[in-house]
């Protein structure tokens, strides 16, 4: 009965949730490295302390099983979960921002396989796809509060807009696990993700700026605004580019569309003649960017992608000057593991920071796999799961 009354209150709160999707705006940060320069003002998402902490984690040693990075933790801070302990088997519910790109599709297959691997411990797994729409996800969470879930996993579509919905779930008495993208509240039992956007953005931007000729022209390609992990990737890249005095001639949103990406790159080639570097806040359309240079008869400049196999193959075949910071899809296993530990009353880390490996020229060969589809991600952490490799093909 307590959960039912709390859920009713939560529904009322959800009805008051704002309708706007997050939009990044410039804002003061109080930090010298956040000041505007050639790349404009820093994003409202930039937090100097978080930036410093993530860069420090790049050199940290994780705790946990050496062969299971999805169970490892960087600098763990354990929290008590005894109040959520209950007997199983359990009903675990998942409110998913979207399945609208290969990264999320590979990740969700990995999560489904983890559910299967847990066998009799999970009685029912409920997945709701918000289709990249804030208001649908708010309604989805509202609906799940009345479905008898034992734990709720949320990958929020955007940060600020989904925060009240997550807070409502917490107030309903559910143990909430947030992963991948964050929210502006501390109420979830744990927030799971790899090192994060600052680390990703920094690694790619440092490499590209160091490999470019001094004062060269750089094109930054972003997916969409308002998502914390993407905003912080750009925030960290901006710091690196400003420090290196890189001439950032454009910052464009691709919507994750290969055709739009190729058109943007071609437009900049036509406008400037030469582009000396390309930085991307995600690698899903990296091959499209490479192809735009090839189609124009231009050398491919230093570029960062991600661990998507099509990019790794092009990198190897064309001998690109490249790097692949990653946001590993193995993180999709961790929320299931965390939810079960919480329901067992075991302590978990909050935040639960996972390792975030980088693919370089030196280790590229170990991640290539010609037997898997081009849109598969090398960091899936899925080779020991039921249905591998067929489930991911």
Question: Which functions belong to the PLM regions below?
Answer:
Residues 1-11:
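N-terminal export and membrane-targeting signals
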Residues 13-18:
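C-terminal motif of bacterial Sec signal peptides marking the signal peptidase cleavage site
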Residues 19-393:
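A residue-level marker of the well-folded mature domains of exported/periplasmic proteins
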